[in-house]
Amino acid sequence: MTFFPEKKGYSLKEFHEEYSKRLSKALSQLDTKSLEEVYLQLAKGVKNNSTIFSCGNGGSSSIAEHLACDFVKGVSTDSEAKPKVFPLLSTPILTAIANDIGYEEVFAFQVERYAKENDILLSVSSSGNSENVVKAIEKAKSLDLFTISFVAFDGGRVKKISDLAIHVEVDNYGMAEDAHHALMHIFAQFLRLQSISEKEKIGKIKF
């Protein structure tokens, strides 16, 4: 099995074209049924005043944090929706748990203390095998949270144990993160669009 890039001898033009082609193909081939199901769960959670917790490592952590920005600020602007999104990514809390207990517990520890039944955990994991994400999902399910994940590569354990997973079928971390970031924007902007009561504003406000 080989992963992109498979060779050193690309020109920048060739690399750009191949990267763009593969990323575009992966996005266009996403399972639309899964997209719809995830959107409905997120919309239901927002309507029911549930908290959406988010987590991830590395580049995925930035997507999990950006989710809060675009849902809390973006979705609520000019709309009736008031999402509650809480990234489990406070540096002091993460480092305290990692130092005193173990890095594999950094998210599960917080889920156990913050979450309540019917909240949502949205996990971002390109590999699908990050131990701290797996443990967070397991803890969330034990507390009756609904679990959603964005994954890539073969989906890993995260895909298997999540209630819903959107699987971006790419074998490159950059493409996985690009696609997951796009998904975050798609869900945030679509939820905002559906929550705008003054329809005459649509087309006149920036998304």
What are these model-derived regions, one by one?
Residues 60-65, 129-136, 158:
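Short glycine/serine/threonine-rich phosphate/pyrophosphate-binding segments
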Residues 113, 121, 176-207:
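A charged, well-structured terminal subsegment
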Residues 44-115:
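Glycine-rich, small/polar surface segments that engage phosphate groups of diverse ligands
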Residues 89, 125, 151, 166-174:
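Short beta->alpha connector loops at strand-helix junctions that form conserved
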Residues 28-48:
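A short, well-structured juxtamembrane/interface segment
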Residues 150-162:
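Short, glycine/polar-rich helix-capping loops at beta-to-alpha or helix-loop-helix junctions
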Residues 1-30:
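Generic N-terminal amphipathic, Lys/Arg-enriched alpha-helix
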